[in-house]
Amino acid sequence: MSDETTTTDRAIISVLGADRSGIVAAVAGLLAEQDVNILDISQTILQGMFTMTTLVDLGGADIATIHDGLAALSEKLGVQITIQREDVFKFMYRL
């Protein structure tokens, strides 16, 4: 990650749903198609429920286009997928 990356260039993608194969590959593939770089990824499976949180560098990618792609992927995989800019995410979840 370059020092020039700001929080407005980054976003948090969250995935929640029943565990199944291919979720990580599908999300990563969509991001790669949009030239979005994964900076950090965390995933957990609790009692059959899959959760994943991913920090990405949007670079010059259009967040609305990524949102639309993730929405279609969410429906296809049967999981919930959300994307928020990092600064909005931090504001909403501050303690």
Segments (PLM) and residue ranges:
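A conserved regulatory-domain signal marking ACT and ACT-like small-molecule sensing domains
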Residues: 1-95
